């Protein structure tokens, strides 16, 4: 996990962090053929650990990779005890298929989300 701080002209601090969540998926969900799904206990441990890391970072914007299920990211964020206005994982609202997605967790208002998949 890598935090970065930006100070704008108004002397306002914005903290941005990025993290690879290593196949964050709901329990009992098969995400790769050669990988066993998370058992409920493993899922809980992973989300608790991620929540603790998110709390430590306390970022205004958190960009994450390897999310299979939007609900799994939402749960991990809740474990942090922090309040975010948006937890977004375009393409994984009902579970990503074939490949994990990226997510955005932010305290800033989000007006619109547009996924670019033509590459």
Where in this protein do the model-derived segments appear?
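N-terminal, active-site-proximal structural segment of metallo-dependent hydrolase catalytic domains
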Residues: 1-80, 90-94, 99-100
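Short helix C-cap/helix-to-loop transition motifs enriched in small/turn-promoting residues
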Residues: 80-87, 111-112
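A well-ordered secondary-structure block
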Residues: 101-119
């Amino acid at each position: 996990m890598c935090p970065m701080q930006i100070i704008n002209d108004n002397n306002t601090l914005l903290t941005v962090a990025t993290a690879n969540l290593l196949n964050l998926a709901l329990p009992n969900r098969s995400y790769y053929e050669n990988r066993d799904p998370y058992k409920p206990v493993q899922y809980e441990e992973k989300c608790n650990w991620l929540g603790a890391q998110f709390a430590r970072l306390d970022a205004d914007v958190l960009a994450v990779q390897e999310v299979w299920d939007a609900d799994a990211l939402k749960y991990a964020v809740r474990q942090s005890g922090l309040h975010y206005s948006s937890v977004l994982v375009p393409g994984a609202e009902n579970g990503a298929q074939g490949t994990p997605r990226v997510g955005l967790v932010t305290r800033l208002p989000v007006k619109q989300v547009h996924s670019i998949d033509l590459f």
